């Protein structure tokens, strides 16, 4: 159906030319194999009600020689959290300033039932799990590094952690206040709202 063809098109897009460090065509990988068949994955998921897609983009991703071990460990954590083995494929992209991994998960659990992932786990839980693993690999970031990253977020043309904090603090009418925990936080919020 339409969903299966869209999923196949997405996998082809992820494997396009020019996305590896060497500018080559990217290769899908999985739990164990460094090269997996996207067509086989698509066929297994053809009848799934949905598919989960997310991007893991560690802030210090450029410090990883290879993102595969991080992605595999992250997926292991997700399986522990969700209480099921997952059928997934991933691909690493190095064609932007921020190396990142696209992960696609079938919409079935290991018992063949529809896989359910809570919205807040998709929006924050996966990010928190990835950050924990990066801290284990590279060590925790200093306060200065975190502040530097937040200052840069003020000018970003994408949803940032500042935006998420503003949305979380919005009232029922979706009105946000610039007052923050401290002067630095207030400056970040005001700068982002002015953008």
Predicted features, each with a name:
Residues 1-99, 103-195:
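N-terminal nicking endonuclease/strand-transfer module with a His-rich metal-binding environment
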């Amino acid at each position: 159906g339409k969903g299966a063809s869209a999923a196949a098109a997405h996998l082809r897009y992820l494997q396009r030319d020019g996305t590896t460090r060497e500018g080559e065509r990217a290769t899908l990988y999985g739990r164990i194999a460094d090269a997996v068949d996207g067509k086989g994955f698509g066929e297994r998921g053809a009848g799934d009600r949905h598919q989960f897609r997310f991007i893991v983009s560690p802030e210090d991703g450029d410090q990883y020689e290879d993102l595969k071990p991080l992605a595999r460990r992250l997926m292991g954590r997700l399986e522990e959290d969700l209480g099921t083995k997952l059928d997934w494929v991933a691909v690493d992209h190095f064609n932007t300033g921020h190396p990142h991994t696209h992960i696609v998960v079938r919409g079935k659990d290991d018992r063949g039932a529809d896989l359910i992932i809570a919205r807040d786990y998709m929006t924050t839980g996966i990010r928190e799990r990835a950050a924990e693993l990066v801290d284990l690999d590279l060590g925790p970031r200093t306060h200065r590094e975190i502040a530097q990253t937040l200052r840069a977020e003020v000018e970003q043309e994408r949803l940032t952690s500042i935006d998420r904090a503003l949305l979380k603090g919005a009232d029922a009418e979706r009105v946000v206040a610039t007052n923050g925990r401290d002067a630095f936080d207030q400056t970040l919020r005001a700068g982002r709202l002015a953008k």
